[in-house]
């Protein structure tokens, strides 16, 4: 029975429809404080934010993921930006659950970036860059994945992983007090940082 919360943690974190991402307010930074109920984050621009953590909120830790782990038929979440010629270039690659809703939508990792949840149908290596062919229910997209593109994998974690100074990604919603309540958390671990 102890495995159930851990499995739910990964499924809740990974099975996100791209549409739902647009409804969240995402925060990226390092943990500045944590009292068991409220997480303080120093954001990348130096500002601070405090986020309520509801009881029972699953925590995901971060595990290393590399091109050697990528397999055809795997469902990936790939964040991209467009070059001037329209070519899509990956800035983040992560495996997600096979049951995750597939599609493409805007994402806030970088200005004008998009996220695609899709099945990897083909990959071609040219020099030090891979080209992914990603298929989802209503379309297909080709993405260049240069060597060194950030990659990571979400794995079950716990509140014990919420240590000061650790990198963290939090998806939140506005609450009735005009503050923020976390709906997902992924925290760095063993030197591996969230890439989304």
Locate predicted features.
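Short, flexible, surface-exposed loop segments at domain boundaries
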Residues: 2-5, 20-56, 60-196
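Sec-dependent signal peptide hydrophobic core
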Residues: 5-12
């Amino acid at each position: 029975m102890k495995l159930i919360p851990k499995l739910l943690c990964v499924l809740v974190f990974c099975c996100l429809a791209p549409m739902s991402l647009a409804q969240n307010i995402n925060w990226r930074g390092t943990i500045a404080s944590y009292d068991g109920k409220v997480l303080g984050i120093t954001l990348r621009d130096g500002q601070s934010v405090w986020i309520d953590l509801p009881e029972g909120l699953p925590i995901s830790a971060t595990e290393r993921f590399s091109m050697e782990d990528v397999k055809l038929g795997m469902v990936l979440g790939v964040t991209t930006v467009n070059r001037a010629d329209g070519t899509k270039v990956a800035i983040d690659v992560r495996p997600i659950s096979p049951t995750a809703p597939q599609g493409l939508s805007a994402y806030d990792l970088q200005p004008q970036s998009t996220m695609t949840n899709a099945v990897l149908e083909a990959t071609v290596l040219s020099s030090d860059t891979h080209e992914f062919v990603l298929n989802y229910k209503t379309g297909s997209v080709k993405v260049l994945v240069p060597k060194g593109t950030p990659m990571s994998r979400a794995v079950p974690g716990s509140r014990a992983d919420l240590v000061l100074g650790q990198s963290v990604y939090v998806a939140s919603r506005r609450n009735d007090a005009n503050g923020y309540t976390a709906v997902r958390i992924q925290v760095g671990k063993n030197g591996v940082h969230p890439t989304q």
